Amino acid sequence: MTIDNPSAFLKTLPTGSGVYQMQDAQGKVIYVGKARNLQKRVSSYFRRQLDSKTQAMMAQVQSIQTTITRNENEALLLEASFIKQFRPRYNVLLRDDKSYPYLYLATHQKFPRLDFYRGAKKAPGRYFGPYPNAGSVRENLALIQKLFKLRQCSESFFKNRTRPCLQYQIKRCTAPCVGYVNEQEYRRQVEDAILFFEGKNDQVIIKLTERMEVASENLVFEEAAHYRDQIRQLRRLQKQQIITGGKGNIDIIGIAESNGAIGFAILFIRSGRMIGHKPFFPNTPLGTTLQTALVEFIPQYYLSPLRNGDIPERIVTSEPLEDRLWIQRALSSGLNRKLAITDQKRAPYKQWQAMAALNAAQALSQHLAQKNTFALKLEAIQKSLALPNPIARIECFDISHTLGEATVASCVVFGEEGPIKKDYRRFNISGVTPGDDYGALRQALTRRYVRLKEGEGILPDVLLIDGGMGQLRQAAEVLEELQVSGVILTAIAKGPGRKAGLEKLFVWGRREEIHLPADNIAFHLIQQIRDEAHRFAITAHCNRRAKRRVESTLQEIEGIGPKRRQKLLKYFGGLQELQRASIEEIARVPGVSETLAKAIYDDCHQHKG
């Protein structure tokens, strides 16, 4: 509804709970808010005394839409949904585009597998986490394997083993695949690992001590020594780890402000053990208070579908939280247990709140320093290449193939804060003569910029091509055909001897090459962007080539059809294991003669590499 007459408009608003959307002259949502009393809350925006941020926002507001909800909890949930949908410029916007990783234990299997997992929790079993990042998961996975020796391999690999793999040799698995440990013994390993995950290290140590004593009494000294080493590792770990004094799952949220920017840091406490922390730097309108930022951050973070509904038993904030009970009730509404949110600085959380705030301040300081550094480097590129306008966004393309096989093009994107990985794209090239880099580049650029013209992204200020004037000409022709304007076209070509630091730069529309000094910061950033595009292209190409070679292996051997090929791969647990096998081992596969085994062996080694 438009607000030509605010007084009359406000009288039409309901007094119940709901959500309001503020829109500008183009109908774009620029702010979303929740309210216990819509009329009272929206009326507050029409007072004479408003802070500078709210004044700037209200100067753009042309209409306000309201949505009535059944209760306050529903209003908070709907607000979070609208913020995610509309991304309003005056809201605090959380940029969190990756789902959270877990450790997954497939307890339904006869010999449960422990592995890294990311995504929706659909498979049966136990999920431990979420962890702040993949590094934390892998670190804990390595620790669990060292302590409890649980298998990590896939089911097909596990079921078709005829000998232990490397994990057994380095003492990271007990090789249940070949019967070196029975189901009962392996289940005991699994139970110990679960107790460890639950923070019950003392119980694990008691059980291991009992087993050590039994083994010693039975004169099985090697087994007793194994339990002794496990106990020592666990006790050493207990001393190294920071323990909260509790056994539950807690998130400690720290917040800090610097030069108008706001940063968060969450300490993840799981089963009384800190497993890591993660910083966040949401888009925050100038003038946003810490309390406002905290109120908007928490629902967005915990209601994100990327979290799979994982909310700990307790959330502790380093600053006072307005509407604390309201947020607590709303977040609890979808849970079958209690949730507590604490903002008071008292034992046992006081030291954790201080630590979280310190982590937030340090992470924000580093983030702003990196942002300023990148902004200076982008400014240096503009000056060094004598470009007419400031640079906020650069895209770089590279082509990768092996003698024309499995050609892939990469597109990487850099902005004022560094690489924007969520905007990276890769293009599998098809219908182009093998080895035709120009044709591959034209196809990738056409696909990319058709989508950008259709609104599926943001046009860059600068398009950088890994190549020379020939590649640059292809880019210019594509953009001209698509009638894309306002993008500066540049290229970086290898110099004499392909030595780093001797590269040549080109700008479309200029005849002369540009040579920048090797210590020029603009040159360093251009090299960094080019190298990132190259890395991304190489990775995608290698994956595509490997997939093709797996598909082509065995296809030309007489007597090997799709079913037998699949049977072979399943028997050995994959192509790599088949390639490692001898002729005698291949001949043990049911239905494979020695002659056929030799043909398979020869074909595998022809495709290997």
Curated annotation (Swiss-Prot):
GO molecular function terms listed in the Swiss-Prot or TrEMBL record = DNA binding; excinuclease ABC activity
List where this protein forms a coiled coil.
Answer: none
Recorded source organism is Coxiella burnetii (strain CbuG_Q212) (Coxiella burnetii (strain Q212))
Q: Which InterPro entries match?
A: GIY-YIG_endonuc, GIY-YIG_endonuc_sf, GIY-YIG_UvrC_Cho, Hlx-hairpin-Hlx_DNA-bd_motif, RuvA_2-like, UVR_dom, UVR_dom_sf, UvrABC_protein_C
Annotated Gene Ontology cellular component terms:
cytoplasm; excinuclease repair complex
User: Quaternary arrangement and interactors, per the entry?
Assistant: Interacts with UvrB in an incision complex.
The family assignment reads: Belongs to the UvrC family.
Protein name per Swiss-Prot or TrEMBL: UvrABC system protein C
The domain of life is Bacteria
Q: Which residues form the UVR domain?
A: 202-237
